[in-house]
Amino acid sequence: MRVIASSIRKGNIIDQDGKLYVVLSAENIHPGKGTPVSQIEMRRISDGVKISERYKTTDQVERAHVEDHDYNFLYADDDGFHFMNNESYEQLMVPKDVVGTAAPYLSENLTVKLAIHEGVAVAITLPQRITLEVVETEPVTKGQTASSSYKPAVLSNGVRSAVPPHIGVGTRIVVMTEDGSYVERAKD
């Protein structure tokens, strides 16, 4: 399906010169003088090579037909990450380079969206927010409650994040999966 370059978003799959690319970032740039352009960073799915392309915002780009399905994460091994389709119970192995930076956030039975192209997983989409436990942080210091400074913390998946001073070890917090940033204390 052909679309204009300015409508391409992160996570889209593009078919360029017979090869599939997953969009890592897409930015529309409107200079004061000249033609607006779309700066798109992509990763080739077949071998993981990253490229950066610039298109006029009105250029036509071929977007590959992919189907998004919900999958539950089962386990990881040396071959890759194993998922199960929620409807058909069919299992699918996804290579490590496709999962990429999403790997630390995968936990047993977590539901994710996998983009499937011709029977092969080409991209993964995590839930926007996920609940994790703080396993290491500095102790709470009295009198710090008025300041809005954040302190470093290590979460149960090994990701480092910045948390407010009142958060201690063992506290469950909600973080954004995109960058690991603190959202709120978990309500459970």
Swiss-Prot record:
Protein's organism: Afipia carboxidovorans (strain ATCC 49405 / DSM 1227 / KCTC 32145 / OM5) (Oligotropha carboxidovorans)
Family: Belongs to the elongation factor P family.
Subcellular localization: Cytoplasm
Pathway of action: Protein biosynthesis; polypeptide chain elongation
Primary site of residence: cytoplasm
GO-annotated biological processes: peptide biosynthetic process
Job of this protein: Involved in peptide bond synthesis. Stimulates efficient translation and peptide-bond synthesis on native or reconstituted 70S ribosomes in vitro. Probably functions indirectly by altering the affinity of the ribosome for aminoacyl-tRNA, thus increasing their reactivity as acceptors for peptidyl transferase.
UniProt GO MF annotations: translation elongation factor activity
HAMAP family registered for this protein in UniProt: EF_P (MF_00141)
Disulfide cross-links: none
Protein name: Elongation factor P
Keywords carried by this UniProt record: Cytoplasm, Elongation factor, Protein biosynthesis
Entry GO terms, CC: cytoplasm
Domain of life: Bacteria
Keyword Coiled coil included in the entry's annotation: no
